[in-house]
Amino acid sequence: MLVAGISAPATAEWLLDADAGVLYDSNLNRAYESADIRADGAVTLGAAGGSYFALSGADGLTLTANARSEIYHRFHGLNLLGLGGTALYRHKFGLGYAAPWILLSASASHDNYRDDIRDSDRVELRAELGKRFTETFDAAFGGRFERRYAKNDAPAVPRISGKVFDLRGRSAYVRAGYAVSDQLLLGAELAVRRGDVVATTRRDFEIFVVSDAIAADPTFGSDFFAYRLRGTTDTAKLTASWALDDRSSLNFAYTDERTDAAGGIIYRSHSANLVYAWRY
């Protein structure tokens, strides 16, 4: 209905993307005791299709549907199939590469995991303001609101919720990109998020007393439990994209995260992923 309601002058361009890659995470379960930390790697697949509508010379709307999958080497309960969609609106305040822009987006998805404790629906809202300062350098800052609705409630403790993956959070970020050449683009992003986080560990009294949801998490072992608590996560991310041709690229990202949670609990994780992306 949204597409049909767009006025006649809008021109549409079909979009089709596909990607395949690998990822590694040093602390998948976000544990804070070294004996409980679990690392793993996965193969990732993704595809998206949709349309871009040029509403005017300064406004554009992109509507896409997407599917993604992650297949883990050791912890098969994390294997994922996700389906979703995104609406993204972008307005440019003027002509030329130096004119600033604003971006608004809304996305929703359903994530189905092999271990059904993680099955959930997600909603994300994002707003961004950015500017290209030179032909090779741009920067932006923005904010996100995330809501995840858990599909299953499996409490491990009486009178305490088992919907560990029923989460909400807000974040702010700043990012920048620099085109070293026609082929190589480098990027960096800093973000801070405040909201619900999940840590999976063996039974632990310190985390138990500050948690508001607890459930058994057999993905990581029969004696592991997932705990939901409040926390602040600081993230630093570095990216590099190498254009192979007009339609494909090889993309690398390294991410470092530190979370300070309730009760003085602190955990860190490092992740890296390499993705081949193709666009029609």
Regions inferred by a protein language model and the residue ranges of each:
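Outer-membrane beta-barrel "beta-signal"
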Residues: 242-243, 267-280
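Residue-level signature of outer-membrane beta-barrel architecture
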Residues: 49-54, 89-93, 129-131, 135-137, ...
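Transmembrane beta-strands of outer-membrane beta-barrel pores
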Residues: 20-28, 51-53, 67-73, 91, ...
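Detector for outer-membrane/organellar transmembrane beta-barrel domains
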Residues: 126-221
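Surface-exposed strand-loop-strand hairpins of Gram-negative outer-membrane beta-barrel proteins
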Residues: 24-46
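Repeated loop/turn-to-beta-strand initiation elements of outer-membrane beta-barrel proteins
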Residues: 56-61, 94-102, 133-141, 182-187, ...
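Membrane-embedded beta-strand positions in outer-membrane beta-barrel channels/transporters
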Residues: 44-48, 82-88, 124-126, 171-173, ...
